[in-house]
Each structure stands twice: as C-alpha cells, then as structure tokens.
C-alpha cells in the first residue's frame, strides 16, 4: 500500500515540479520583460536602473503605460549614471515550504552603492514580488556628506 501511495504521489505530484511553465524573464535590446500567464511588466533597461514602461493585466486585457522616465530605484534627485548593469534569470525549484518560481535578478551600481533587485514570479499569480538589496555607501551620491542623515 505504501508503494502504491508513493507511486501515485510521484505521478500526480510531479506537475508542481514544473511550476515555471508560464513564467518568463528576458532582456531584448533595451527592454526587460517579466511575467507569467496573468501579469506582465515591461521595463526600459537604463543601464540596470530599470524604468517601468508598462504593466499589463492579462486576465482582463488592461494595460497601464508609465509616462515618467524616472528610474524605479531612486535615492536622490540628481542620480549618477548607473554602471555594471546585469541580469540573471534563474528557475528556483519548489521546496517543502515554498512553491517553485522564476527569479529575475537585476543588479547595478550608483557610484559606491550596489543595488540588487530580485523579482519573484510565480505561476498563476497576478502579482510579481520584488526584494531590494543594498551594499556600499551613499556619501558620494548625497554630495559627499560624511554625517549620517539619521544623526541630524
């Protein structure tokens, strides 16, 4: 009986091992596109400091175009030019705790500040998660001030 249950679980539970069938992320020319069967986000690459161009809800066919050319990550009014922009698209297998997803990592630098934005795209989910990681210093970005803004 135990062997039969194990066999049934492997046969019918195997579908969840391929949970990224509808998820995608790719950079073509200067446009980054990420999404799944329900939602799609399109960005202008901008050296890695991406700018949202369009958000599309595929379930109802509605699309919202962003008319601003401001980068999605902004720490000050006068941003330096981004450098070292890179993209990594990695399928992540499911675990006992988390379902499978597609991880899209966008990394770039603003002078001495390194920024990594990690988008998580799940099958059949009408939302795209985003985590932002920072490393380095921002003194040069804020005009070379040595005093922390929190200490004022």
Per-range role (PLM):
Residues 4-15:
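Sec-dependent N-terminal signal peptides
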Residues 20-85, 91-151:
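Beta-strand-rich N-terminal accessory domains
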């Amino acid at each position: 009986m135990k062997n039969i249950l194990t066999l049934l679980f492997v046969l019918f539970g195997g579908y969840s091992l391929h949970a990224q069938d509808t998820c995608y992320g790719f950079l073509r020319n200067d446009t980054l596109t990420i999404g799944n069967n329900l939602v799609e986000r399109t960005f202008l690459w901008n050296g890695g400091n991406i700018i949202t161009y369009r958000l599309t809800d595929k379930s109802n066919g509605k699309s919202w175009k962003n008319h601003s050319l401001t980068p999605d990550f902004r720490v000050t009014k006068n941003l330096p030019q981004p450098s070292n922009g890179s993209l990594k698209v990695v399928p992540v297998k499911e675990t006992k705790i988390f379902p499978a997803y597609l991880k899209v990592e966008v990394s770039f630098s603003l002078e001495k500040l390194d920024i990594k934005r990690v988008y998580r795209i799940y099958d059949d989910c009408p939302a795209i998660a985003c985590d932002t990681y920072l490393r380095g210093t921002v003194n040069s970005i804020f005009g070379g001030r040595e005093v922390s803004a929190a200490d004022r």
